[in-house]
């Protein structure tokens, strides 16, 4: 009988993530890629890579994520709501955890794990999400990792409306125009 691997596919608003676990829950494969709005193509690229690497295995799989329901239906795979999937994973692999914070491409989620499970989500505004961070990085002509490097070198903190992407973009432009010291350490 072929050995089994368990595959999880998470399709978010901007990325596709694939992870494969052994029956003993050891991570065998993990990929995180931007789908550039072509979810099916990126999912197929990652699953083809997985199939080549584990051709002699029997595979169980399920899909989660805001963009995963349609893909699950097309592929005939079970769908699990992402907050439930990540809660189960954290409770399984890190049972000492009190809080899960997830910054998605277009929303934020927080799950409290004390005295039961309390899950909350901010889906009304993209401020502080992955898409927001990407946009701010683009405005500063760096990638998301480059923002961290800029922050390490900064000599001053400038106020930016972090609750709203529109106001943050306006604040960033205004600060840059009105300050000769803006990101002087770049």
Where on the chain are the PLM-derived regions?
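Short glycine-aspartate micro-motif
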Residues: 4-10, 60-62, 96-101
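Single conserved hydrophobic/aromatic residue that forms the stacking wall/gate
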Residues: 177-186
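Short beta-strand-loop/turn "lid" adjacent to the catalytic site in phosphate-handling enzymes
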Residues: 23, 32-35, 50-84, 111-120
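Adenine-nucleotide phosphate-binding core of ATP-dependent small-molecule kinases
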Residues: 168-176
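Short glycine-rich, Thr/Ser-proximal phosphate-binding strand/loop in the N-terminal lobe
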Residues: 3-41, 45-48, 118, 123
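Short beta-strand scaffold segments in enzyme catalytic cores
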Residues: 16-21, 107-113
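Glycine-rich phosphate-binding loop plus the immediately following alpha-helix
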Residues: 115-152, 156, 164
């Amino acid at each position: 009988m072929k050995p089994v691997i368990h595959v999880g596919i998470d399709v978010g608003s901007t990325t596709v993530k694939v992870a494969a676990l052994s029956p003993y829950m050891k991570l065998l494969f993990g990929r995180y890629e931007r789908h550039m709005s072509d979810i099916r193509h990126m999912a197929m690229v990652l699953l083809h890579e997985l199939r080549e690497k584990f051709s002699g295995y029997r595979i169980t799989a399920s899909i989660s994520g805001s963009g995963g329901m349609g893909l699950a239906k097309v592929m005939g795979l079970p769908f699990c709501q992402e907050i439930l999937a990540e809660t189960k994973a954290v409770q399984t692999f890190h049972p000492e955890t009190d809080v899960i914070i997830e910054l998605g491409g277009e929303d934020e989620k927080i799950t409290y794990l004390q005295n039961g499970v309390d899950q909350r989500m901010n889906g009304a505004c993209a401020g502080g999400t992955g898409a927001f961070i990407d946009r701010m990085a683009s405005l500063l002509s760096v990638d998301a990792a480059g923002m961290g490097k800029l922050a390490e070198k900064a000599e001053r903190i400038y106020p930016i409306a972090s609750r709203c992407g529109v106001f943050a973009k306006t604040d960033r432009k205004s600060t840059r125009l009105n300050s000769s010291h803006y990101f002087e350490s770049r």
